């Protein structure tokens, strides 16, 4: 793309995002769902997107939404200008509180000059957070561990990373952790990404009894890119895994057509580790041309609203450089067959 084209595209994106930000501000007090933009596979983007972020806040990305903590929805997200992880809360998934930083970067550690891409689990009376620490000048990423009694004030359990790249397929980076607590097995289950630091290449799996010492799966990597030329044919990353009512596991993930073009898809596995099968309806959420997410739709965070029979999916979208948070929903719990 020519420099002139890039400048024009940037101006258009700024105009679009300014309009979206104004629309979001006007609806803040309404606390209701407006209309949605519908896709062919049943997923609908909220028309008031983005629901969090704007030019003043700067880039917000890689969200993780959980229920516990005094509000129905608690969104932990990466706040790029602050190099930190922040929390925003909401009663409806649309209108979010002003963010507060819950964990700052720690340049003195030598491995977390910036921190981002976190996952939080409420278990045994505490909030357990695993997060990505990065040193971009040497293109490396590690995973750290922190805990909190209130979900806001986190303290590091150890000053050292709890997961580091060791295998060939991990390259210089392990990042994007997503953790579930399995009380039956008495372990934490982690899905994480590895490979390159800018955008990872594959998805891997590990287990831990204490959240500090992790055993990586012999089946790693457990999830690869799609076929050449497919919507996710360049690489995969940024996943969340949920247990379905029938006992199977569903993974929502980022699929990359190329390094700059990303969409969101899903796959299903019986054990959450092996034999992942992509949904036939993929991609589930993709960029809307000319909109605030016109270049890429990244890292999904998903809530299964069984009471109302729907899925809620938050993601970070990009048009040009800035990234903000949007919402998509799917009425009905059935997401279709696998390929």
Tell me the role of every PLM-derived stretch.
Residues 20-339:
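Carbohydrate-active catalytic/glycan-binding domains of CAZyme proteins
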Residues 1-7:
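Bacterial N-terminal signal peptides that target proteins for export
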Residues 9-18:
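Bacterial N-terminal signal peptides
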């Amino acid at each position: 793309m020519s420099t002139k084209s890039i400048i024009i595209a940037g101006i258009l994106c700024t105009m679009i995002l300014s309009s979206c930000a104004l629309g979001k501000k006007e609806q803040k007090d309404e606390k209701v769902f407006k209309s949605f933009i519908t896709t062919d596979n049943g997923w609908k983007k909220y028309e008031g997107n983005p629901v969090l972020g704007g030019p003043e806040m700067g880039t917000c990305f890689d969200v993780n939404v959980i229920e516990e903590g005094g509000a129905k929805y608690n969104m932990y997200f990466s706040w790029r200008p602050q190099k930190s992880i922040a929390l925003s809360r909401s009663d409806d998934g649309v209108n979010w509180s002003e963010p507060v930083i819950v964990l700052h970067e720690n340049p003195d550690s030598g491995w977390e000059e910036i921190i981002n891409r976190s996952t939080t689990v409420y278990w045994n009376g505490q909030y357990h957070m695993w997060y990505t620490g990065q040193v971009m000048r040497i293109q490396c990423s590690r995973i750290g561990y922190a805990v909190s009694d209130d979900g806001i004030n986190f303290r590091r359990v150890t000053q050292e990373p709890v997961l580091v790249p060791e295998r060939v397929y991990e390259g210089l980076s392990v990042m994007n952790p997503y953790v579930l607590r399995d009380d039956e097995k008495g372990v934490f289950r982690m899905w994480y990404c590895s490979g390159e630091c800018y955008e990872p290449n594959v998805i891997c799996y590990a287990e831990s009894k204490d959240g500090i010492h992790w055993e990586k799966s012999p089946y790693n990597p457990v999830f690869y890119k799609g076929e050449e030329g497919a919507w996710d044919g360049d690489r995969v990353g940024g996943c969340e895994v949920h247990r379905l009512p029938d006992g199977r596991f569903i993974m929502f993930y980022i699929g990359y057509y190329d390094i700059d073009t990303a969409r969101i898809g899903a796959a299903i596995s019986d054990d959450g580790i092996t034999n992942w099968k992509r949904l036939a309806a993929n991609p589930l959420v993709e960029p809307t041309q000319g909109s605030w997410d016109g270049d890429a739709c990244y890292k999904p965070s998903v809530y299964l609203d069984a009471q109302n029979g729907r899925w809620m999916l938050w993601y970070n979208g990009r048009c040009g450089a800035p990234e903000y948070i949007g919402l998509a929903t799917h009425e009905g719990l059935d997401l279709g067959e696998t390929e």
